[in-house]
Structure formats: C-alpha cells, structure tokens
From Swiss-Prot:
Catalytic residue list: E80, D108
Superkingdom of this protein's organism: Viruses
The name this protein goes by in its record: Protein PA-X
Gene name of this polypeptide: PA
The family this protein is said to belong to: Belongs to the influenza viruses PA-X family.
Example GO molecular function: RNA binding
Keyword Nucleotidyltransferase: no
Gene3D superfamilies: Influenza RNA-dependent RNA polymerase subunit PA, endonuclease domain (3.40.91.90)
Gene source species: Influenza A virus (strain A/Singapore/1/1957 H2N2)
Amino acid sequence: MEDFVRQCFNPMIVELAERAMKEYGEDLKIETNKFAAICTHLEVCFMYSDFHFINEQGESIIVELDDPNALLKHRFEIIEGRDRTMAWTVVNSICNTTGAEKPKFLPDLYDYKENRFIEIGVTRREVHIYYLEKANKIKSEKTHIHIFSFTGEEMATKADYTLDEESRARIKTRLFTIRQEMASRGLWDSFVSPKEAKKQLKKDLKSQGQCAGSPTKVSRRTSPALRILEPMWMDSNRTATLRASFLKCPKK
C-alpha cells in the first residue's frame, strides 16, 4: 500500500500526509491504510477548490490556470492541510471578516460565495452512514457537509452539492480510479476491511524481513485535519504546485 500511495499521489500530498502522521505518532509503515486515506482526503479537498473563483460581481466562475484572469479571488479557502495553529488563525480571520459563526472543529474549506464552512468526507462505506457520523460530531447547521464515496455516490447537506456537475464528476472519477488501481494490486479488500488489513500487514512485514512477532495492532485514533508544512495565504499562487497536475497511477 505504501508503494501504491507514493506512485499514485502528488509528492507534496504524500509529504503532507507523512508529516501529519508523524505529528500524531502514527507509523505509516504500519498504518498504511490511514496513509492512503489521508492522501485521498487531502487530494479531494484540493480538487474541490480547483479553478473556482469569484469575479467582481460576486459570481462564481471557473477559470483555467493559464487564463489571464487567474488573479480573481479564490472561491474556496483551503483550511485542511495547514498547521493547526495556522488553520485556526485562518478560521478566526474568516469569522472576523465575514461574520461567520466560529466552528467547534476545524473544517476543511470555506466557501466565500455561499459564506459557509465545508466539511469534506471520503468514505469506503455507505455515504448516508458516514454523513450521519459527521453530522453527529459537528452538531452545527452552519457547517456544510459533503460526502463522497469510492463508488460514485455522494451526499450533502440539504442536497446542496455546491459544485457544478462537471467538477464533482472529476472528483468521483479520481476516487473510482484509485479504487480500481487498488483492486488491480490486490489492495482494495484490505483498505475496506480491518480484518483484511491485518492480514495484508502481516504479509507486508514478512516480505520486508521483519520479525513475525512485530506489533500489528492498528490504532483507532482519528487524526485531526492534515498539517501542512508551511502556511498558504490566499493568493493566485497558493496552490499552484498542487493544482498544476495530479500524478496518474502507473499501470501495473
């Protein structure tokens, strides 16, 4: 799984995920499924905001990177992936500027068009189950929730999907591709099932020549929002390196 992640995700996303796991004492060599899940979630957050801007009339428009109007205001502020202190600084700044209610938990994005924070979810289970879990945790009608699955399903607060159909299709296609690539490598079952994950882990440890008695317990702790290696204040180049291109999974 670790090799798969390094091959199929943008190197910067991989580095951010590594730093997030290290900060919380999680070993990516052991918790490879969590490593893959963190990378997937971060990529979806960036794809969610890709090419979406707000013009002078306050209208949401889609602009390609090489467009001369790329200096328009970004529609979405990316909070996920920042250092925790920086993330709360950005959230507080947004609340002070827009009058938005401060969320109890760090959200993933802020939508300047709809003036609301957004919580993004990527699940390997039924979307409605994961949606309810998110809603019960957040307990706030002010934070908009949008859940994606690897099967192309999605669910959002009040069926308001925020993005246009084409933008959402890009995310769904990427998730489906990740699932297919995992399946072709025999990794999907272990990614979905904890029992299969333990079997795969033992197999990986043996193949690496490690002691058969090495610990195989997978931590149940949930990592908070990803921690980015440096702040990205809102400007036209803040996510250029990530938006330039997402690496495609090489053929098996």
